[in-house]
């Protein structure tokens, strides 16, 4: 809830299978627990850094999904090889640089957020146009206007990573799609004059 400056996040160490609404922890943007009896996720500081840096974000998902994590572990961006990718991501989904020993041994989770933000700033990317990132040697984070959209983007990211992996097996020299095809597919859904859908 951006107006109230509050974030609802999963509790640390509680298995998803047994998780209920009562387990959810509410924190403020400084990480102080406002509601709940459980400790918040160990990744809370990463989430808070992203909420502060990217005002359009209303929900964040961090996974270790198989195919996207392969790209993260390889330290590779996820290129836009086709229109499935271009419908959601306006270009390659970036992979961050490797974190330094000092960053990892220091405030690791906050520094994970910082390296994501640094990646977007240095590459001139916006979190609205590329609603996901791959953290090198770690895994993907995806986001959206709310939690439902964040999950949706995480699912699409995983499918795009799976298709990209197999595309490279068939065509190791495959290049990303042409910019005009990327523009056409992304902008018809997300541009100022979007034509996709009924609204």
Stretch-by-stretch model annotation:
Residues 1-199:
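Glycine-rich flexible loops
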């Amino acid at each position: 809830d951006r107006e109230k400056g509050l974030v609802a996040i999963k509790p640390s160490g509680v298995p998803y299978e047994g998780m209920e609404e009562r387990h959810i922890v509410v924190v403020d943007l400084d990480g102080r627990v406002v509601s709940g009896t459980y400790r918040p996720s160990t990744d809370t500081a990463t989430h808070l850094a992203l909420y502060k840096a990217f005002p359009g974000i209303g929900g964040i998902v961090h996974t270790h999904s198989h195919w996207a994590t392969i790209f993260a572990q390889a330290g590779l961006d996820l290129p836009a090889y086709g229109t499935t990718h271009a419908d959601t991501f306006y270009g390659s989904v970036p992979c961050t640089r490797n974190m330094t020993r000092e960053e990892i041994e220091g405030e690791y989770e906050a520094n994970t957020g910082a390296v994501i933000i640094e990646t977007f700033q240095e590459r001139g990317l916006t979190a609205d146009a590329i609603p996901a990132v791959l953290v090198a040697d770690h895994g993907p984070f995806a986001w959206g206007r709310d939690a439902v959209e964040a999950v949706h983007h995480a699912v699409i990211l995983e499918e795009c990573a799976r298709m990209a992996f197999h595309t490279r097996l068939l065509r190791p020299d495959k290049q990303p799609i042409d910019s005009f095809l990327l523009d056409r597919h992304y902008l018809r859904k997300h541009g100022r004059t979007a034509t996709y859908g009924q609204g």
